[in-house]
A protein has these predicted regions:
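Residue-level detector of well-ordered alpha-helical segments, enriched
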Residues: 24, 186, 190-191, 379-383
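Extended amphipathic alpha-helical segments enriched in small hydrophobics
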Residues: 353-394, 398, 402-406
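Polybasic, glycine- and aromatic-enriched phosphate-binding surface used to engage nucleic acids
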Residues: 141-357, 361-365, 369
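Non-globular, low-complexity intrinsically disordered regions
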Residues: 411-417
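Generic structural signal for hydrophobic residues
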Residues: 59, 238, 312, 383-384, ...
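Signature of N6-adenine DNA methyltransferases within the class I
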Residues: 1-170
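A general structural signal for short secondary-structure boundary/capping elements
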Residues: 88-93, 107-108, 271, 320-325, ...
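A generic structural motif
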Residues: 73-77, 329-335, 378-382
Length: 417
């Protein structure tokens, strides 16, 4: 506890937020940089989290403000396989004119034999809290990304609706059930259609047919949502299921134990759409067509009044927006792309504001067919790219460059799988 106080003091003294989520290495780096001489250099082996996690955003800003040169050396292979954590070599320099940041990507430690630090130029470092993963793209590509951010033909995903985490049940195994369990305890009238895993989503619509397929396949496709009424009013079968949970200790988990009534799941509402939190090739964005809900494996989206969900859907499946999913998200481990609600909100979408119904349906049906049948997603991106080129006059070279950015960042991430 004393050590935590010292760490907090180091962070707050330098204008940074302190909380229990911040690892000790963050404060250690700040303290060391603060002690550097005017022309000093410093080097660390750090968790690769420094590049992207939210709790290190204050650190990224601090380092960009206090160092003239930052060099990062990353590795495609795990350097310390026993700890299964990605690391980077961080080199910071004070003094002289500001040069910015540069990144060297290496396969493994053997590449140090041929490393030439003079062969990689610095990029201008933006003094913001944004992720440093964006510096894996070239200066020309970064210029395009920044241009898109200020182009009036684009807007942030968050401008279309509220993006929230899925339902935290506290115990998915207990609260998400199969048809068999539902029938056994007569739970039909206290369950909602559920998306419990990424594999439950098939196309860009989640329909009653999709839900039926999941149920008949024996998946936990129902969420138990007991009403906030006195327990005495519950049926005997429902009381029996609650007693079953208590006998097996399901009520003792932290999330359940802090509720007034452990078996009533909070914050249950039906969203307009879903966005996958953790993804392999790309994040699926799916419209809700059967009043389903989701666990926290999937984010929930409630569109603002007047927003056409289908136009937002079309505006997502293109090379530019896909490039932003990789820029805004983070590599979670094993090559998985994790993207949190605030990061989804920062994805740039082209403003498709008007489209004849038959044209809109044709585009969505073609994209849905590609996604639903696990065809190459680039076929869907081709459709989306041509749509925004035709409707908004987007330069085709922008789509080509962003497709290249998406492939590059996706490939880098997947090489860790």
């Amino acid at each position: 506890e004393e050590q935590r106080k010292i760490q907090s003091n180091i962070l707050t003294t330098h204008g940074m937020k302190a909380n229990k989520l911040i690892n000790a290495w963050v404060a250690f780096v700040v303290a060391c940089v603060q002690m550097l001489s005017d022309n000093g250099k410093i080097a660390f082996v750090l968790p690769a989290e420094i590049l992207q996690v939210a709790y290190a955003e204050d650190l990224r800003l601090y380092l960009s403000n206090h160092l003239q040169k930052i060099t990062l050396i990353t590795f495609e292979e795990l350097v310390f396989p026993n700890i299964e954590q990605e690391v980077v070599v961080f080199i910071g320099e004070k003094g002289g004119e500001e040069k910015g940041i540069r990144i060297f990507e290496m396969n493994n430690l053997d590449d140090f034999d041929t490393l030439d630090l003079s062969q990689n130029g610095f990029k201008k470092l933006q003094h913001v809290k944004e992720k440093w993963t964006k510096y894996f793209v070239s200066a020309k590509e970064m210029e395009l990304i920044n241009t898109i951010k200020t182009d009036k033909r684009f807007t942030r995903f968050s401008d279309y609706g509220l993006i929230n985490v899925g339902i935290t049940t506290g115990n998915n195994n207990y609260f998400s059930v199969t048809d068999e369990v539902c029938e056994m305890y007569d739970l039909e009238d206290v369950t909602l259609p559920l998306i419990g895993r990424s594999s439950h989503l098939h196309g860009v619509y989640f329909t009653s047919q999709d839900w039926d397929e999941n149920r008949k396949g024996g998946k936990r496709a129902r969420l138990i949502y007991f009403p906030d009424t006195p327990l005495e009013q519950y049926s005997e079968k429902h009381k029996e299921y609650i007693k079953l949970g208590e006998d097996s200790g399901e009520d003792k988990g932290y999330k359940c134990s802090i509720r007034d009534r452990w078996y009533i799941v909070p914050s249950v509402w039906v969203p307009d759409a879903f966005f996958l939190r953790r993804n392999n090739l790309y994040p699926k964005f799916v419209l809700n067509r059967c009043n389903a809900v989701s666990t926290d494996t999937t984010h929930r989206i409630k569109f603002y009044e007047g927003v056409d969900p289908e136009l937002v859907l079309i505006s997502y499946y293109n090379s530019i927006s896909f490039a932003f999913t990789e820029i805004c998200g983070r590599s979670y481990g094993g090559g998985v792309l994790e993207i949190l609600p605030g990061e989804v909100g920062n994805i740039m979408l082209p403003k498709i504001q008007d489209l004849p119904p038959e044209k809109k349906n044709d585009i969505i049906n073609r994209i849905d067919n590609i996604v639903r049948n696990n065809l190459d997603i680039e076929l869907a991106l081709d459709i989306g790219d041509q749509t925004i080129i035709d409707l908004l006059g987007i330069d085709s070279s922008w789509c080509k460059q962003c497709r290249k950015i998406w492939r590059k960042l996706q490939h880098r991430r997947l090489k860790r799988s």
